[in-house]
């Protein structure tokens, strides 16, 4: 059962608009064939031409060649894995670290159900979800910054 709002044809303002032809697709330019055959291919081919042109005119180096016999002193993951890397690095029990990593998406899945009875969309009128979001963001930033530091300074961020 779909929820659609049917127009009120007894409304005189709507009837006047319909009498003028407004509210229907009787004005403007049709999408077929004008947009689909002429404008879209030009935009797509122009995007491809710009991408290929930039790749040919300004080839960027990938970086220094890899040396399989030299490993870096500390292997760091990509920046978006820093918070969970910090969890794995600081928790002594690795099983607990993996469970804490699995708790991150599980916790994110529970946030919408904490205030599902609240009908407001304004964050200031949803204090529980907003508080959880702000605390989670602060913890993720704290863990992310700590992952880039040596392990003895990672939890305090070198401030103490």
From Swiss-Prot:
Checking InterPro entries in the record gives:
Cyt_b/b6_C, Cyt_b/b6_C_sf, Cyt_b6/f_cplx_suIV, Cytochrome_b_C_euk/bac
The molecular function terms in GO held by this entry are: electron transporter, transferring electrons within cytochrome b6/f complex of photosystem II activity; electron transporter, transferring electrons within the cyclic electron transport pathway of photosynthesis activity; ubiquinol-cytochrome-c reductase activity
Q: Where does the record say this protein resides?
A: Plastid, Chloroplast thylakoid membrane
Any one annotated GO CC term: chloroplast thylakoid membrane
Q: One Pfam family from the UniProt entry?
A: Cytochrom_B_C
Q: Which GO terms describe its biological process?
A: mitochondrial electron transport, ubiquinol to cytochrome c; photosynthetic electron transport chain
Membrane topology according to the record:
Multi-pass membrane protein
Question: Which HAMAP family does the UniProt record give?
Answer: Cytb6_f_subIV
Name the UniProt record assigns to this protein: Cytochrome b6-f complex subunit 4
What lineage is this protein's organism placed in? Eukaryota, Viridiplantae, Streptophyta, Embryophyta, Anthocerotophyta
């Amino acid at each position: 059962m779909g929820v659609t709002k049917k127009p009120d044809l007894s409304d005189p303002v709507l009837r006047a608009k319909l009498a003028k032809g407004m509210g229907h697709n009787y004005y403007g330019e049709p999408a077929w064939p004008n947009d689909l055959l002429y404008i879209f291919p030009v935009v797509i081919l122009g995007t491809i031409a710009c991408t290929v042109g930039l790749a040919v005119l300004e080839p960027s180096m990938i970086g220094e060649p890899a040396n399989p016999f030299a490993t870096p002193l500390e292997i760091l993951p990509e920046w978006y894995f820093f918070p969970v890397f910090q969890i794995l690095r600081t928790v002594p029990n690795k099983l607990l670290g993996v469970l804490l990593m699995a708790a991150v998406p599980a916790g994110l899945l529970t946030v919408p159900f904490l205030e599902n009875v609240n009908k407001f969309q304004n964050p200031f009128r949803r204090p529980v979800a907003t508080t959880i979001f702000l605390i989670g963001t602060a913890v993720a930033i704290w863990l992310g910054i700590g992952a880039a530091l040596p392990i003895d300074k990672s939890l305090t961020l070198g401030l103490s």
